């Protein structure tokens, strides 16, 4: 890059023979009459203008830069060098010292304010430049040795005779010898020293630099140390409050997380305040006034010596079979219910209303017109959950199966039955996430009193519903109509009767509504209905539910930024929405290997992958 200041362009008449055409260097047309000549090039007077502003250059000075002609004002504005002392553009002779440029008259001694004589030694004490007369005298004891040492270059070792010298690291250097020890780059600005040797910033960081454990960048300037970790002051943030740490403030370090002392104490206090109120093998449910959106509506579960808190239970689906305890201490009997023919609807307690309003297994056929005389629950080898019921004697009661008609709500009398009896402990602690119970539902004699077209003879019908936690079939379609659940056209078609009432108290407290087909002699008619078991585990295996695949970036959850996840994802099973290839990349193992890990290990891996 070169810029040459040119005098005014010369007006020259066209002296070449007419046979040889002279072209304008700007427009390329033939030059006729009076032209301008700059070096060996010719221009029309109207074509010789500034490249930047377009002003006429025929009457003033200009600069040539990379073949372009620029006026003085634009050249200084675009490419000019300013004096470090007076901040004006430098034209002509320039003095460079310590990476800065000066006018010769502006580069003066800091003490006597006189310009430095040509060839005089310049002493730089780290702040100011002083001439040889104003520099501090050397010690008298070894003046000859010191004087000789000051005249030797710290880089090449040669004597500094005439010209300027650079003082750095207690040595004198030729201006061209003060270079980086590693890459040999000329150090005319900032540098970093190590063991008396100068380095540029990049090479110093590559050899001796300290990386920030927060942003993984090199630390220049202030550094915050926490144990063996180092941080920029702006990168050390408390994981609880997100605030920075002040200088000298105490901090707690836990893994890769750092805490303020007050924030850590507050977190411990919150952990201690969570006390379990359960028996040896029971689950505490929230009051009936709680919202139904809380995960499984469970706060704590105690199974033997193991206590499962909300974080462990949050990793399970909302209807996970956590209630299927294979080794119960108690087995509860359902109370007896008697219905009257005509009366107002029975008002239940607050706990019953909450259970009834939740998702329950019931029939959805719209053709029911009769009433049911009795419905009861048959206990199996597994005990149902104990619920808090206001007004009961012991604070516990048993779930019951109450059946009502939609058209005629009967009134019922609630009679308490013996509550509990003990079962010997088998000593075997089974897996609580498997072996859901088998329910048996008996429908007694049904009478149709409103439709004269139906048969008046009473028939005894029994419907068996087997619920299996590992069932592979699920109902994915909308509510089935009565035609899809009816019998074939060759037989007597019996109208589907809906179990009257909106509440069905089964031993599984939270379950999904399903449609049951019409009964026949040998049991359920499964030709036209694809039954989904109530309370079945939707995440028992990868094959029972199809998870929509999303990229890993859209599933990440952090505590600093509120991330909006897709609507159809399972928030407790975010890793199920990864493709097998991306799952292998994120967790370093296959899906089958991940499922064989313990629950706490899976949760720990999900936390590290920001999927928890």
From Swiss-Prot:
Function: May act as scaffold protein. May stimulate ABRA activity and ABRA-dependent SRF transcriptional activity.
SUPFAM superfamilies found in the cross-reference section: Glucocorticoid receptor-like (DNA-binding domain), VHP, Villin headpiece domain
Domain HP: start-end pairs: 544-612
Chain residues that bind Zn(2+) 1: 83, 86, 103, 106
Residues annotated for Zn(2+) 3 binding in this entry: 212, 215, 232, 235
Binding site for Zn(2+) 2: 109, 112, 131, 134
Matches recorded under InterPro entries: AbLIM_anchor, Actin-binding_LIM, Villin_headpiece, Villin_headpiece_dom_sf, Znf_LIM
Any GO MF annotation of the entry: actin binding
Modified residues (Phosphothreonine): 473
Biased composition (Polar residues): 394-416
Top-level taxon in the UniProt lineage: Eukaryota
Name of the molecule in the record: Actin-binding LIM protein 2
Residue intervals of the LIM zinc-binding domain: 22-81, 81-141, 151-210, 210-270
Primary localization: cytoplasm
Sites of Phosphoserine modification: 282, 294, 365, 368, 453, 477, 579
Location(s), subcellular: Cytoplasm
Binding site for Zn(2+) 4: 238, 241, 260, 263
Region (Disordered): 269-295, 341-433, 471-498
Gene Ontology terms: cellular component: actin cytoskeleton; myofibril
Organism (species): Mus musculus (Mouse)
Complex formation: Interacts with F-actin and ABRA.
Keyword annotations of the record: Cytoplasm, LIM domain, Metal-binding, Phosphoprotein, Repeat, Zinc
